[in-house]
Amino acid sequence: MAIRFNLIGIAVADMGRSLAFYRRLGVDVPAEADSEPHVEAELGGGLRMAWDTDETIRSFDPDWKPAPGGGRLGLAFACDDPAEVDAVYAELTAAGYEGHMAPWDAFWGQRYAVVNDPDGNGVDLYAPLSGQPVGPGRGR
């Protein structure tokens, strides 16, 4: 058997608000998906991202409860350069999303910032400081 990682799933309280956030990060999700109870998007490289409303999850797991306080999932989005980290952070916070950590130059050689998605999950934005390429293993 060849098992492989294939999907990142996020439980959401408000599908439309969550999808609007991830669209701003470049995830290709059709506008008509905002009212759906389950949505999936291809990320490339054989990976998918999925969102399920709390109600959808309870439909097959009636005792399910969202984890209190969020922050149980970390996602990281690579930016082309440090200026893009700053710009994306500014765009998201100006749109009303909660900034958790404003952009800073991290000791590990990256420009880094963290914005919380609508359900309280930290979403990292990063880019190399030294001009090194962004790629596998270069995130947090």
What would you call each of these model-derived segments?
Residues 107-110:
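Short, small/polar residue-rich loop motifs at catalytic or cofactor-binding pockets
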Residues 34-35, 102:
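A short glycine-rich beta-strand->turn/loop micro-motif centered on a GG-aromatic cluster
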Residues 1-6, 11-33, 43-98, 116-140:
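Glyoxalase I/VOC metalloenzyme domain signal
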Residues 98-104:
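Active-site/ligand-binding-proximal alpha/beta "capping" segment
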